[in-house]
Amino acid sequence: PIIVSFEVSTNRWFAKGTKVNDFELANTIKLANSENSINGTKRINGETWSTQTREVTIFPQKAGTFTLPEVNIEISVNTEHDGIVEGSIKTQQQNFTVTLPKALANIEHFIVSPMVELNVTSNAITHKDYAIGDAVSIEIEVISQQSPAMMIPPLEHPIINGISIYQKTPKIFDTSNRGQLVGKRIESIT
């Protein structure tokens, strides 16, 4: 993922949270509610300034050059003489490039994650002869760290002559583990 940080600062203090207005970026997925908020301070020319940083996580869907558009940011500052002053500022366009590692050049489906876990459970009995009409259920769970569930591609099930496959609607959901996004996709077939 790409994390875009928007930082604003004042030599006073903020009256309320800074808001980064929504923006579109073609061929990317920007998660709803992915905006993280960080309040802090820093020293500028010997003075302490208050800062508010907003981070937005973006998942590019292909390699190439992207142009982050101008983004409108709404701020509210407590001033010394004029009370609360509200306004907005715009960022400048920024370009960034996404490249696909050579190892993935000919791979159609992959998961971008530092850690992927695969769990398979089944009611199949090893070394059993199955008869016509017997059913075996399999549940496949894919868990990806730091990647939303929507980025886990659907599993492909081969067509086998004489065998019917019935697939339930996949369960797809995201959770957070100590502030880290965890995506999970569960597919059940019989």
Labelled PLM ranges:
Residues 1-190:
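Surface-exposed interaction/ligand-binding surfaces
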